[in-house]
A protein has these predicted regions:
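Bacterial N-terminal signal peptides
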Residues: 2-13
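A generic structural signal for residues embedded in beta-strands
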Residues: 55-56, 131, 520-523, 552
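Short, gly/Ser/Thr-rich active-site loops of penicillin-recognizing serine hydrolases
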Residues: 235, 552-553
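His/Asp/Glu-enriched, well-ordered alpha-helical/loop segment
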Residues: 343-354, 358-384, 388, 394-398, ...
């Protein structure tokens, strides 16, 4: 009897009219979909329901899921790719920079001063001026700015303006006075107070020395941080970025992210990564959080060194343009045993660990640290990451795959730094700079990001940089260190499936397959078939997150 009843119920269900619950919330048709899924790499249509993909296939197959309330997107033959995952962002900093004076594209010191003075006139007296994202390397004469350049433009307003890489700032006399930085102030561990021939501070502070001024700057309010993140979230949608790994953040940033999460204002998924130095707090906060597909703590980030642009990246040999220095260790890597102890403790606590390393010595040192910690803590799927992995010795390239270390890299830096890097480190070391091709050929996992706000958030710009390597000054039309170019599909994977794997999220996103999150991007041009030189002309036409259109051009 029970078998008969079950059979009848099955037949009734099979013959029942299609219910609204079976209809898709969104259907995309007539597209050229690169799914990133090896089981079905190409399709023309997909459907989403409840924020996830319920069908991928042909128009005929997927079109059956249309209902009266289904949002239908006409792909018009355009290229569709999985939502871009940015493996390295500084979202609040990016938001604040969109609100601040933009000094990134100034032409020379005089232009720098003009723009700064014009912005200062819009600011109340006494209010701090920060950010700026200046880059002296774009000037014809790349002389570093000093407080003498700032003082006439800023008046009595304290000003400390960060270089685009975030590893150096130039401060005016008012800010230095408030921080009590003088000729008697010693360089802090991991930092440099740049001085003139008389020993007086020029206003330039490198790495840990910047903290002397940041310590006296009023903290940003919760509402200010929230507004900066709202602006950053909109900017992400405009660029087709559907997920970010946001690092290294502080408690104020995470509090603001949680406010946006509760308000339902998130249109980008956030994998938040606090500082390695606060790994215990990260562990405890993660235990209290919901940690869903919108907001979670994924790991912690540390530092070994500084940056190439600030001459604080750590190398085995001195800089070619300054033989007195080979770079510096970051303060948390002095001594290196301190950093190693934190890596080991965070790893044992179940946190993914990623460490910033730019110079070849910094990369060699952290690879050795990762190897020792893995042996000490035992085998597991830990996915250690090196952020930037910028300058590598040839012998260290193969160690990434051997040790299972992910190279989390930002390709736009290659076409930016490539204008002047060779002057700083010479030709031989440049050959394994941003070594995308060599790392992939050695079997390493390559995850891409932007390092926004240091570089533009645009993944299209990043793909162009990885594929073409044409420097921003136009002097390398065939590519700077062209042997390190990679293909478009390889770059796409670094921004999608491998980026997802770099955050332990490959089961949720990074490719377009049934059951995964319905995050995808509609592009104006087919980056997989157009001449590579035309990639920069590509625009994001639409961004879809969780089956909802969050941006449309």
């Amino acid at each position: 009897m029970s078998v008969l009843v079950a059979t009848l119920l099955f037949l009734m269900a099979a013959r029942a009219p299609e219910s609204s619950a079976e209809h898709a919330d969104l259907v995309l048709l007539s597209a050229k979909i690169w799914t990133g899924d090896s089981t079905r790499p190409q399709a023309t249509a997909l459907a989403a329901r409840g924020g996830r993909i319920v069908a991928v296939g042909s128009d005929a197959e997927v079109g059956k899921l249309r209902g009266p309330k289904t949002v239908v997107v006409d792909g018009k033959g355009r290229r569709v790719v999985p939502g871009f995952i940015d493996s390295h962002t500084h979202m609040s900093m990016g938001g604040f920079n969109l609100l601040a004076v933009d000094l990134r594209h100034t032409k020379d010191p005089a232009d720098f001063t003009r723009k700064l003075a014009a912005f200062a006139r819009t600011r109340p007296a006494g209010l701090w001026m920060t950010d700026g994202a200046w880059d002296h390397q774009v000037w014809a004469d790349p002389v570093l700015p000093t407080r003498a350049l700032l003082d006439p433009a800023t008046g009595d307003r304290p000003a400390c303006l960060s270089r685009t890489d975030g590893h150096m700032a130039v401060c005016n006399s008012r800010a230095l006075a408030l921080a009590r930085v003088s000729r008697e102030t010693p360089d802090p561990p991991g930092g440099v107070i740049v001085r003139d021939a008389r020993g007086e501070p020029t206003g330039l502070l490198k790495d840990a020395a910047m903290d002397l001024v940041w310590a006296v700057r009023p903290a940003r309010t919760a509402s200010e941080v929230e507004e900066a993140l709202r602006i950053a979230v909109r900017h992400a949608a405009e660029n087709g970025v559907t997920s970010v790994q946001d690092l290294p953040g502080n408690a104020a940033d995470l509090d603001a992210w949680e406010v946006l999460r509760r308000e339902g204002k998130l249109t980008v998924r956030v994998d938040y990564r606090p500082s390695l130095s606060e790994w215990q707090k990260a562990r405890d906060r993660r235990a209290r959080m919901k940690n869903d597909e919108w907001l979670r703590i994924g790991g912690v980030k540390g530092y070994v060194d500084g940056s190439l642009g600030s001459s604080t990246a750590l190398f085995f040999e001195p800089y070619a343009d300054d033989s007195k220095t080979s770079g510096v260790y970051a303060s948390e890597a002095i001594p290196l045993e301190k950093l190693e102890a934190r890596v080991a403790a965070a790893d044992a606590a179940g946190l993914q660990v990623e460490v910033h390393a730019i110079g070849d010595r910094a990369n060699a040192e952290i690879l050795a640290v990762f190897e020792r910690v893995a042996k000490r803590n035992g085998a597991k799927d830990r996915r250690f990451r090196i952020e930037h992995a910028q300058h590598l010795r040839r012998a260290d390239i193969t160690r990434f795959a051997k040790l299972g270390v992910i190279a989390s890299m930002q390709p736009y830096h290659a076409i930016d730094d490539g204008r002047w890097a060779q002057k700083r480190i010479g030709l031989e070391r440049s050959r394994t700079t941003y070594a995308f091709r060599s790392l992939l050929d050695a079997g390493a996992l390559l995850a891409f990001g932007s390092d926004w706000d240091v570089a533009p958030l645009s993944p299209i710009s990043g793909i162009d940089a990885a594929v073409n390597r044409r420097t921003l000054d136009g002097k390398n039309p065939k590519g700077w260190i062209p042997e390190q170019k990679i293909g478009v599909e390889e770059a796409l994977r670094a921004y999608t499936s491998t980026a997802a794997r770099a955050g332990f999220a490959e089961k949720e996103k990074g490719s377009l397959a049934v059951g995964k999150l319905a995050d995808f991007v509609v592009l104006s041009r087919d980056v997989l078939s157009i001449p590579p030189g035309e990639i920069p002309d590509t625009r994001v036409d639409a961004t879809v997150v969780g089956g909802q259109i969050v941006y449309s051009r």
